[in-house]
Swiss-Prot record:
It comes from Homo sapiens. One of its GO terms (biological process) is polyprenol biosynthetic process. This is Dehydrodolichyl diphosphate synthase complex subunit DHDDS. (2E,6E)-farnesyl diphosphate binds at residues 34-35, 37-38, 85. Keywords: Disease variant, Endoplasmic reticulum, Epilepsy, Intellectual disability, Lipid metabolism, Magnesium, Membrane, Metal-binding, Retinitis pigmentosa, Transferase.
Amino acid sequence: MSWIKEGELSLWERFCANIIKAGPMPKHIAFIMDGNRRYAKKCQVERQEGHSQGFNKLAETLRWCLNLGILEVTVYAFSIENFKRSKSEVDGLMDLARQKFSRLMEEKEKLQKHGVCIRVLGDLHLLPLDLQELIAQAVQATKNYNKCFLNVCFAYTSRHEISNAVREMAWGVEQGLLDPSDISESLLDKCLYTNRSPHPDILIRTSGEVRLSDFLLWQTSHSCLVFQPVLWPEYTFWNLFEAILQFQMNHSVLQKARDMYAEERKRQQLERDQATVTEQLLREGLQASGDAQLRRTRLHKLSARREERVQGFLQALELKRADWLARLGTASA
């Protein structure tokens, strides 16, 4: 089965899609593709067949999203917790991943045609080396495409992602790229695997389970959470349509919460900067409440220097990650 399933919506689907597009549309949807094993049991087939059908449904769902103008999709393909499953099932999932990433490399022309950028998010060091190399090749082959984006979370949990981001910031301080005072929520956000993506507008979980299973916990604090009873391989265009309707009904509340959170971040940063400037002035024997122009000048310099350090650190971090991926992809070429 192809990664990209080409084709148009049916006449009725197109009609309903045009209606729903009159409202606010999500730009980024995340999926917890749950229910493959229960589907296999229901259909009395092997678990591996259930996972294969789940991948086929992903390709179909990407087609729906593309036709609806939803240009970024993130999927929870394999949790670090899944390594605790039986060896036979884990081995089967690794084999399926090998097949699908090998197939992806055979479809480079189709990916180029649609401008699909594939990103794989997670701790790839936990995967077999040959699979790491296949993933690196796929990511490298599509990294310059920018019409639409598929983020595959593989060997991923949100706690692992956040702890890794904290380690990256600590590395920046150790290397002298950052000051300890530069550490903030905003910087942590930029150190996550998802740093190049906007936060999801909708998170959809299938199979009826009402939990996030350690998926995008940081990124979905202001997302529309939709839990649907359908098993993932049985997901339909109308299930997606329903999720978008829920998003539209809650859009104004979600947007207001996002705006308030962004303003609160700015306020907290300004308070920290003001406290730092006050401390500097007192150390120099000047009145903390003295010359307003001097305080503004100091605040501006403090902010500019921090931004310069942060940008230098982020460039170094991106270079470090890209270099590792490039060397991995070259090793298997």
